[in-house]
């Protein structure tokens, strides 16, 4: 038997040893016949040329090692999904995919995957490859047949039923249902064209959802719920309350929390014998995009012919029901995982679907004004850039316009023409960095760096936020995006889609200020205070640390916040804790850095670095002298900290030992954080695993508590029939944001606070987690919670009658004072400067305010 191995570039790897192909004739080929450290480019590829001849037909099997050979010869991406599997492509039937054994040096957690790959390769070449069992799949294009099938499923014996949908868009308001897939048993599936979904068919679909005899299974439930509810009017409340509603994506997340591993295709490839069942669909998509010259992200499924769509769609639900039957028993064998799935993730999923569906209200008028002002400011910044002669000289020498977004041109300008000294910070490729941090440092050498920072900031605000939001607003004036439970290893929610609501600019209010409550409503934002430290105090059982929080609750005037108390203790400050924030703001920030450094496993050197960053930032803000924190200082601070909180130290050590000895750790709510690289020979990798595992138990305690509090509050609001008057629309980091009718704010606040502070076995007795309002008294007009009025008062006037009246009053008052002064002083009748100065006391945006108000 002749076997070939093809890899990326020349190397000394003994593939016969790695693949255990002893005694077989193995030839090794390299796509590039030279050693290569970077990316493989087209110009590097020599395989198949006279200098590097290769013909797969000379071999019984060809093992493609790594992503590059797999894509080049088998036409596919996703080597991790295909590793150990045989692939037919381009007339050759015996390509075998494999991840590279070189990965094991820096990703030892891949060893089980590679071992399974080797075992599968031996099965294939020795004729022991498992033959996939044939399935019963069919399309339904007749309404009567659709009704008959759905009725049959409803009347069948108890069992799981898997559903899926194919759609013309990613958001239910942007598109429509193309069809619905259903599988009522393994190795079976139908795809029903949406034209066949009559009232009778939809009626029986609802009957299936409500039937106690049926377990309802989806993969990525939240996505399909949007379309089923919006386009078919189906409801899932009964199935959810009876714990019959399931999501195989979340099931897999419970069993393997790593990112990027939860897609249906990947899971079907890994856990079933279905193989690459959507190959024809992917090929059509690729061919269509090439033929019509469109980007893959612009491709929509309504472009796929029905004959190509239905086999793929019908198999999706077969894959889903098989995965459910495989995953759920594993979860239900483990009490902690079972609790996490049923009590946290599934309620969270249903709740987040409601949150997404409500949308976030946007003031289009504010957004357009923001676009106008930002564009104006960007043009001014670009004009300022050209006042520096070095820019004009560079353009003249290179005979092309300078592009501030070109990193290459930026380096040439800053280091060759302006002559700045690089900061020492390098990119991954070893070049001098020009990121925001580097430009901030370079700004101390020359003002051009500050101008470039301003251009970069304004460009991002316009392109990433303003323009994107304007294109994404639904007809009701809201933007709808995604919140996800399965995208982080720690359990923190993430946001993506039309807008990442967790990455809105914090210090710049112009974007948040465009999230505006409708008339008669207010934006209410509540935020957990020092949440991760609080839960560390609870989980550790450190009475001294818990007492700090008890003091803060019982005597808030004397003990205002945790970090002030810690600064008072660590730095032995000669003042009351309540005065620390005012008298020693830099040391308070330093204390904060020490606390989080200790919790997240930083040593003295890293703590010293974090403290110095905090001190420098405060020095820049306040003008206080900067006094460096040395490593010796940091070591002393850590010792003082643990001397005060000894049980915290013992708990941290215990958690670290659990991770080192067992390679996993459970959170309070049952999350299992698996640290696959804990036994790595690289101490840096091992240390990162310990930090990651410990971080997860603290962060998940905070995020899960907040999520469950919001879920319970939302359920209570719905039970009171107030869902339209009190809408939770965002969960961002440690805060819950809602749109609430003005006369119900007090009631909403009571409901939310009570549910978030509910004792879930993770509270200090008599001292629940603190929760503070980010909003102004009585609620805020917009999500900036008052910052918009200070930073952009002209925009704040839009869609805010109350603030507009106030601003107009200031203008009238200034005008009256001007006329009075002019009447008294005939020699100097023009007192417009006084008028402007008086108004600037209210805002710095006089010209735009006058333009908008017509003043």
Curated annotation (Swiss-Prot):
Keyword line: DNA replication, DNA-binding, DNA-directed DNA polymerase, Early protein, Exonuclease, Hydrolase, Nuclease, Nucleotidyltransferase, Transferase, Viral DNA replication
Catalyzed reactions per annotation: DNA(n) + a 2'-deoxyribonucleoside 5'-triphosphate = DNA(n+1) + diphosphate
Boundaries of every 3'-5' exonuclease domain copy: 107-332
Cross-referenced InterPro entries: 3'-5'_exonuclease_dom (IPR002562), DNA-dir_DNA_pol_A_CS (IPR019760), DNA-dir_DNA_pol_A_palm_dom (IPR001098), DNA/RNA_pol_sf (IPR043502), DNA_polymerase_A (IPR002298), RNaseH-like_sf (IPR012337), RNaseH_sf (IPR036397)
Region (Polymerase), start-end ranges: 333-833
Pfam families recorded: DNA_pol_A, DNA_pol_A_exo1
Gene Ontology biological process terms in this record: DNA-templated DNA replication; double-strand break repair; viral DNA genome replication
SUPFAM superfamilies: DNA/RNA polymerases, Ribonuclease H-like
Top-rank lineage group of the source organism: Viruses
SMART domains: 35EXOc, POLAc
Induction remarks: Expressed in the early phase of the viral replicative cycle.
EC number annotated for this UniProt entry: 2.7.7.7, 3.1.11.-
GO molecular function: 3'-5' exonuclease activity; DNA binding; DNA-directed DNA polymerase activity
Domain notes: The C-terminus seems to increase the affinity of the DNA for the polymerase active site, and thus increase processivity and decrease the accessibility of the DNA to the exonuclease active site.
Subunit structure: Single-chain monomer with multiple functions.
Family statement drawn from the similarity comment of this UniProt entry: Belongs to the DNA polymerase type-A family.
Known role: Replicates the viral genomic DNA. This polymerase possesses two enzymatic activities: DNA synthesis (polymerase) and an exonucleolytic activity that degrades single-stranded DNA in the 3'-5' direction for proofreading purpose. The DNA synthesis very likely occurs by strand displacement.
Name recorded for this polypeptide: DNA polymerase
Origin species: Escherichia phage T5
């Amino acid at each position: 038997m002749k076997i070939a191995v093809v890899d990326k570039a020349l190397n000394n790897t003994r593939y016969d040893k790695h693949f255990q192909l002893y005694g077989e004739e193995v030839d090794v080929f390299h796509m590039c016949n030279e050693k290569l450290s970077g990316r493989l480019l087209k110009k590097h590829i020599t395989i198949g040329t006279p200098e590097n001849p290769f013909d797969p037909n000379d071999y019984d099997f060809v093992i493609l090692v790594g992503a590059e050979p797999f894509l080049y010869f088998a036409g596919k991406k996703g080597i991790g999904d295909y590793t150990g599997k045989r692939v037919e492509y381009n007339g050759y039937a015996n390509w075998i995919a494999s991840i590279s054994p070189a990965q094991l040096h820096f990703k030892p957690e891949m060893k089980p995957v590679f071992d399974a790959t080797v075992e599968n390769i031996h099965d294939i070449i020795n004729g022991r490859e498992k033959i996939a069992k044939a399935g019963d799949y069919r399309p339904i294009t007749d309404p009567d047949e659709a009704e008959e099938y759905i009725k049959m499923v409803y009347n069948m014996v108890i069992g799981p039923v898997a559903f899926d949908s194919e759609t013309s868009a990613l958001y239910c308001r942007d598109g429509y249902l193309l069809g619905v897939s259903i599988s009522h048993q393994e190795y079976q599936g139908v795809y029903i064209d949406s034209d066949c979904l009559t009232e009778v068919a939809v009626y029986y679909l609802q009957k299936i959802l409500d039937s106690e005899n049926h377990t309802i299974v989806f993969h990525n439930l939240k996505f399909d719920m949007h379309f089923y509810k919006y386009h078919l009017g189906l409801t899932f409340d009964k199935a959810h309350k009876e714990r019959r509603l399931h999501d195989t994506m979340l099931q897999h997340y419970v069993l393997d929390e790593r990112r990027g591993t939860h897609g249906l295709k990947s899971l079907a490839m890994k856990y079933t014998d279905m193989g690459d069942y959507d190959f024809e669909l992917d090929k059509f998509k690729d061919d269509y995009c090439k033929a019509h010259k469109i980007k893959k992200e612009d491709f929509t499924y309504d472009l796929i012919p029905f004959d190509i769509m239905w086999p793929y769609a019908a198999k999706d639900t077969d894959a889903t029901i098989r995965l459910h039957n495989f995953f759920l028993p594993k979860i239900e064998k483990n009490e902690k995982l079972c609790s996490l799935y049923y009590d946290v993730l599934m309620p969270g999923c249903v709740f987040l679907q409601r949150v997404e569906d409500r949308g976030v209200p946007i003031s289009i008028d504010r957004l357009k004004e923001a676009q106008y002002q930002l564009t104006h400011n960007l043009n001014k910044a670009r004009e300022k850039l050209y006042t520096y002669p070095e820019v004009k000289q560079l353009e003249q020498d290179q005979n092309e316009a300078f592009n501030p977004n070109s990193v290459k041109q930026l380096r040439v300008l800053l280091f060759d023409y302006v002559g700045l000294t690089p900061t020492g910070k390098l990119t991954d490729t070893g070049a001098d960095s020009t990121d925001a941090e580097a430009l901030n440092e370079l700004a101390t050498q020359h003002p051009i760096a500050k101008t470039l920072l301003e251009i970069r900031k304004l460009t991002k605000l316009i392109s990433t936020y303003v323009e994107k939001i304007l294109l994404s607003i639904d007809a009701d004036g809201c933007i709808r995006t995604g919140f996800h439970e399965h995208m982080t290893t720690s359990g923190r929610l993430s946001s993506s889609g039309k807008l990442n609501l967790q990455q809105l600019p914090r210090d710049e209010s112009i974007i948040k200020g465009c999230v505006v409550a409708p008339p008669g409503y207010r934006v209410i934002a509540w935020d957990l205070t020092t949440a991760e430290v609080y839960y560390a105090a609870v989980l550790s059982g450190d009475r001294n640390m818990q007492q700090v929080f008890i003091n803060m609750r019982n005597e808030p005037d004397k003990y205002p916040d945790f970090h002030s108390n810690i600064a008072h203790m660590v730095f032995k400050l000669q003042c009351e804790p309540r005065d620390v924030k005012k008298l020693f703001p830099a040391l308070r920030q330093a204390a904060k850095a020490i606390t989080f450094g200790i919790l997240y496993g930083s040593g003295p050197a890293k703590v010293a670095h974090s403290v110095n960053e905090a001190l420098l930032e405060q020095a820049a803000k306040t003008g206080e002298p900067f006094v460096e924190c040395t490593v010796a200082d940091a070591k002393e601070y850590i010792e003082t900290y643990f001397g005060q909180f000894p049980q915290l130290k013992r708990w941290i050590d215990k958690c670290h030992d659990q991770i080192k000895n067992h390679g996993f750790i459970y959170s309070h709510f049952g999350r299992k954080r698996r640290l696959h690289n804990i036994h790595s020979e690289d101490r840096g990798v091992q240390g990162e695993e310990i930090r990651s595992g410990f971080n997860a138990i603290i962060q998940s305690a905070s995020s899960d508590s907040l999520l469950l509090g919001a879920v319970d509050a939302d359920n209570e609001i719905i039970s009171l029939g107030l869902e339209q008057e009190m809408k939770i629309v965002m969960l961002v980091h440690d805060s819950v944001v809602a749109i609430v009718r003005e006369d119900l704010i007090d009631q909403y606040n009571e409901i939310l606070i009570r549910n978030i502070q509910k004792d879930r076995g993770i509270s200090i007795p008599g001292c629940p987690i603190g929760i503070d309002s980010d909003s102004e008294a009585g609620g805020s007009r917009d999500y900036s919670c008052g910052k918009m009025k200070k930073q952009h008062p002209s925009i704040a006037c839009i869609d805010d009658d109350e603030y507009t009246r106030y601003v107009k009053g200031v203008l009238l008052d200034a005008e009256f004072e001007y006329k009075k002064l002019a009447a008294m002083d005939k020699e100097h009748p023009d007192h417009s400067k006084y008028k402007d100065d008086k108004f600037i006391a209210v805002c710095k945006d006089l010209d735009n305010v006058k333009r908008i108000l017509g003043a």
